[in-house]
Amino acid sequence: LRELIGKNLVYAYPFEADTRLKLKTSVTAAAAKDEDEPMNYLSLDEEITTERGIAMHKFMENLDFSAEDAASELSRQRAEGLIGEDQAALLSLPALQKLLESGVLGFLNGYTLFREQWFTVNVPAPLCGLEGGEIMLQGIIDLLAVKGDEAVLVDYKYSGKDAPSLVKTYERQLSLYKYAVEKSLPLKVQKTYILSLSLIHISEPTRHSLIS
């Protein structure tokens, strides 16, 4: 299965953060169709929040899930060149420690974890809220957890939105990720989750009937 995932869902480690965001644009754009407000240029505060969000994603990408001390874990990632000094400086050690102590992803014990899996898959345009036939969809799955022929997807968000707002905004995105995995791999996605890295809260969208 690991070889199959490597073939159909390709690791994204070689890509820089700005490339990562560009690759996610198509899925994010599809999710944005559920937003009530138009997308505007980022303010300075929003730009800082975005940079901190990218840094949090990088920390999570390389996180040893058995780590108990945030300072030691961040030092390890810095020493191994897994996270840059500028990104590390954006992170709050108390917030990271709270995340480690929360056990919010403890339910994934026993799963094989695949991180930062990017994909390209053809999907019917209506699933993205568009007209026409099939379109090519690109995206990155933050965390794909596999046990047997079943899978769980987790998407990380660093946002000021509360949990219900995150679900409303990104449930289509998670549905598209589920579709991509099940189309590309012999897996059945049992659950999808949004993990708010700012709230340290995990939510489960329930909109998958859109694309079943």
Model feature map: region roles:
Residues 1-147, 151, 170-172, 179, ...:
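Nuclease catalytic cores
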Residues 52, 157, 178, 206-207:
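Basic side chains
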Residues 77, 160, 209:
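The DNA-recognition helices of helix-turn-helix-type DNA-binding domains
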Residues 118, 144, 157-159, 206:
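Anionic group-transfer/hydrolysis microenvironments
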Residues 122-124, 152, 160-163, 203:
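Flexible loop/turn segments at secondary-structure boundaries
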Residues 156-167, 197:
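Short beta-strand-loop-alpha-helix junction that forms the active-site gateway
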Residues 167-169, 207:
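Short, glycine/charged-enriched secondary-structure capping and boundary segments
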